């Protein structure tokens, strides 16, 4: 041990020193404004070659990416600043050693991370960012520093800088300021590149290009165009199915096509395309389908077919009046119609003095005075005063009415009524009220409406004398007026005998109907007025029905029947009192007598 001690003592002091002296670099590190980012001054000790090799490996040999280099530099600065603060505070040397060892461990961790290669041009602007394989750059010759750029020609630098300023007005600040030694620029790099080696998001967009050589585009897009193209690759129009690559074409399409809407001049409706407007004019807006007969226009073809079938199916009126445009079947009818527009009335009736415009009107009027019936039915030899009456009568023999509506199936005896009915389907209302302006399909309907303004009531009640404006109102009144209740408990036959003084004579055989004994019926039935036309049995009315019986001079003899004759057709309103069934009292009383006699025989 004694021999070994002198050997140990003979070791030069230059190869043996404490760890604190080797790693305490707070006072030996400084910044300078030259091409190299850092420079370190150290004593001639063993740690000096090691530190130089580390610096060369970080910055030149392994060509670490700039973001990792900045991370290491930032960590060293932070560690250096922390060491300076510890020296100023007079901390222990052991604490300094621990901090330095932690900083070296962090450097080793950062060094082992994946390499990222940043390519710059002569003007220190970033061209490409790529990743290396296993920490080795793909093409180290592509990395350029500011010291290499300084050897270039000044003319090329000016030209490149001018072009690059136009193409890339907003360069990446963290990657451009990497080559400068200003303290402000270094602080900006440390802010943009974190301690963990992350890079900004703008640089990661170009990582897919790899380590290929930079290719300068002839006419690069401006940042606004790039942003628009990246925002939507395919832009679809909202109003039509067209698709565009750029927003500029889409806006141009919107201005030309959709914002200049096609407006219909007739109805004001707007359309996107001109073809839609033309289709609208042909179908919906313009009535371009015209009837040849009456010149009426329609929108649809089927409407024209229905119009021809309904209106012009039976005949075609090709001739029209020049004054009122009324149409007729022949020109002769037109000439006869023109007389209606003149004020002259040369044809006068000799009997009553009434004047007419046409001779035919005078002939028709003269039939009222003479009673002549020139129109005869060939089937039953019945004669009529007017031709329309004969036409209406012919429907009895035919089995159906002559004029039938093809639209609804309703039939009519007279053509006048048929024409008025057809107007309900076509929508024509030529008759207008002079007071309120309401239009109607027929003149009788207009006259009935006009009574609401004038207050005219032409329909009186025969029983009570009350007057009504319309015939249906009178009919409803008659049903109510004849339904007057009689006293309860009185037999209907007895009620009739009490109220009728003409039947109170017992000699007639009807006054005491419940107690009277009528002899057996004679060979000639007393109640049959005519053997060819017997009266059908009538049902007995309600016991509470009251019959308005008026005294009259007609007496019916049961033994002698009246002379056979054809009864005339019943009038609309008889002068005699009617019961609730619209029958006279005589026929009803005869029916009661027949029923009573039949009950007594049984």
Curated annotation (Swiss-Prot):
Residues 80-108, 148-167 have a biased composition (Acidic residues). One of its GO terms (cellular component) is nucleus. A zinc finger (C2H2-type) spans 235-258, 262-284, 289-312, 319-341, 347-369, 375-397, 403-425, 431-453, 459-482. Residues 561-571 have a biased composition (Pro residues). Keywords: DNA-binding, Metal-binding, Nucleus, Repeat, Transcription, Transcription regulation, Zinc, Zinc-finger. Its main location: nucleus. Residues 60-232, 543-575 are annotated as: Disordered. InterPro entries: Ikaros_C2H2-ZF, Znf_C2H2_sf, Znf_C2H2_type. PROSITE patterns: ZINC_FINGER_C2H2_1, ZINC_FINGER_C2H2_2. One of its GO terms (molecular function) is zinc ion binding. It comes from the Eukaryota. It is found in: Nucleus. Residues 545-557 have a biased composition (Basic residues). GO terms for biological process: regulation of transcription by RNA polymerase II. Residues 65-79, 222-232 have a biased composition (Basic and acidic residues). May be involved in transcriptional regulation. Belongs to the krueppel C2H2-type zinc-finger protein family. PANTHER family: KLUMPFUSS, ISOFORM B-RELATED, ZINC FINGER PROTEIN. This is Zinc finger protein 652-B.
């Amino acid at each position: 041990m004694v021999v070994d001690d002198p050997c140990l003592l003979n070791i030069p002091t230059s190869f043996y020193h404490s760890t604190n002296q080797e790693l305490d670099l707070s006072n030996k590190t400084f910044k300078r404004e030259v091409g190299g980012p850092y420079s370190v001054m150290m004593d001639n000790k063993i740690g000096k070659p090691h530190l130089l090799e580390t610096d060369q490996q970080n910055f030149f040999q392994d060509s670490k990416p700039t973001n990792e280099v900045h991370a290491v530099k930032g960590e060293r600065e932070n560690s250096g600043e922390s060491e300076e603060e510890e020296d100023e505070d007079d901390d222990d040397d052991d604490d300094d050693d621990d901090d330095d060892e932690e900083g070296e461990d962090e450097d080793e961790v950062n060094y082992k991370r994946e390499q990222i290669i940043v390519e710059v041009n002569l003007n220190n602007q970033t061209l490409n960012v790529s990743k290396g394989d296993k920490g080795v750059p793909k093409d180290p010759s592509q990395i350029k520093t500011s010291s290499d750029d300084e050897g270039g020609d000044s003319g090329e630098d000016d030209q490149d800088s001018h072009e690059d300023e136009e193409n890339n007005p907003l360069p990446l600040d963290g990657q451009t300021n990497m080559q400068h030694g200003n303290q402000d620029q270094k602080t900006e790099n440390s802010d943009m590149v974190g301690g963990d080696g992350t890079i900004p998001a703008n640089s990661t967009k170009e990582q897919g290009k790899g380590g290929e050589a930079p290719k300068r585009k002839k006419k690069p897009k401006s940042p606004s165009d790039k942003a628009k193209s990246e925002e939507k690759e395919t832009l679809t129009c909202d109003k039509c199915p067209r698709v565009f690559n750029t927003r500029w074409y889409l806006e141009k399409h919107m201005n030309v096509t959709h914002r200049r809407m096609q407006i219909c001049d007739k109805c004001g409706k707007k359309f996107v395309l001109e073809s839609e407007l033309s289709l609208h004019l042909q179908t919906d807006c313009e009535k371009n389908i015209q009837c040849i007969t009456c010149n009426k226009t329609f929108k649809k073809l089927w409407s024209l077919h229905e119009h021809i079938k309904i209106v012009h199916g039976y005949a075609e009126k090709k001739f029209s009046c020049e004054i009122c445009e009324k149409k007729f079947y022949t020109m002769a009818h037109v000439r006869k119609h023109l007389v209606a527009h003149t004020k002259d009335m040369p044809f006068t009736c000799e009997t009553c003095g009434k004047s007419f415009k046409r001779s035919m009107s005078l002939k028709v009027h003269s039939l009222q005075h003479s009673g002549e019936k020139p129109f005869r039915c060939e089937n039953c030899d019945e004669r009529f005063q007017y031709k329309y009456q004969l036409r209406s009568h012919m429907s009895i023999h035919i089995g159906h009415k002559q004029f039938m509506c093809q639209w609804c199936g309703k039939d009519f005896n007279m053509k006048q009524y048929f024409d008025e009915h057809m107007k309900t389907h076509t929508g024509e209302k030529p008759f207008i009220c002079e007071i309120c302006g309401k239009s109607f399909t027929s003149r009788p309907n207009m006259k009935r409406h006009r009574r609401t303004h004038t207050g005219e009531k032409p329909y009186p009640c025969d029983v009570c004398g009350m007057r009504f404006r319309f015939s249906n109102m009178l009919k409803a009144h008659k049903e109510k007026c004849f339904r007057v209740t009689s006293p309860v408990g009185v037999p209907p036959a007895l009620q009739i005998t009490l109220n009728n003084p003409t039947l109170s004579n017992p000699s007639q055989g009807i006054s005491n109907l419940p107690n009277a004994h009528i002899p057996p019926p004679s060979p000639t039935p007393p109640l049959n007025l005519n053997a060819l036309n017997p009266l059908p049995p009538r049902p007995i009315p309600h016991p509470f029905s009251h019959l308005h019986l008026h005294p009259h001079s007609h007496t019916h003899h049961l033994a002698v029947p009246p002379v056979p004759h054809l009864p005339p057709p019943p009038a609309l309103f008889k002068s005699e009192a009617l019961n609730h069934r619209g029958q006279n009292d005589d026929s009803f009383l005869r029916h009661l007598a027949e029923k009573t006699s039949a009950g007594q025989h049984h």
